């Protein structure tokens, strides 16, 4: 009570994080070696699966919320799994003829937890609701994995906000959008950035709203936009 609350979001319904974050928090403790030791233990696997099959108000159970059909391993590097990058856990499991929970654990163990993922659990209705909230900070939340496929938000977050939600859908004004991308998050974090004032850093970005176009997508995410 009494604490100022803000939040941030980016304009995609698909999220991205590390695949290891699918595990319940208590099974992530101790670092990579400890996690891999648990994943190599059949009893621990059963305990993890038992937790993941239940809704939780203690942690964000993405497996239960999204399902393995909507969880994709976006970066895979080992000989065993490298060719499956970009496929869903369910699809990979099908090709190995095994339960998707075991496929998840096998991937994490083989790749030593160095895997990024994509998942879809939001809706456009959710997006519009939060975009209109005055507490929203507009961000990219970019993760730069070593190889594999980035989330298109890395290259497309800000131009998509400006094209889809300012120019096309007119959810908010260009002034409000730029403020939520620059000065507002800077103020929340206490950084002297984001405004055109004497003595401030000259980090100025010029763009043509009518000419803005987003080229990054999930198949070809590493594409610059045009118009900036």
Segment roles from a protein language model:
Residues 8, 97, 141, 177, ...:
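Divalent metal-coordination and catalytic microenvironments
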Residues 41, 129-135, 140-141, 205-228:
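C-terminal cap of metal-dependent C-N hydrolases
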Residues 1-170:
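Active-site neighborhoods of metal-dependent hydrolases
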Residues 116-125, 187-195, 214-220:
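Flexible, glycine/threonine-enriched loop-and-boundary segments that flank and lead into catalytic domains
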Residues 193-196, 201-204, 208-210:
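Histidine- and aromatic-rich ligand-binding microenvironments
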Residues 159-171, 180, 209-220:
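Feature captures the catalytic cores and cofactor-binding loops of soluble hydro-lyases/lyases
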Residues 110-114, 183-188:
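A short structural micro-motif
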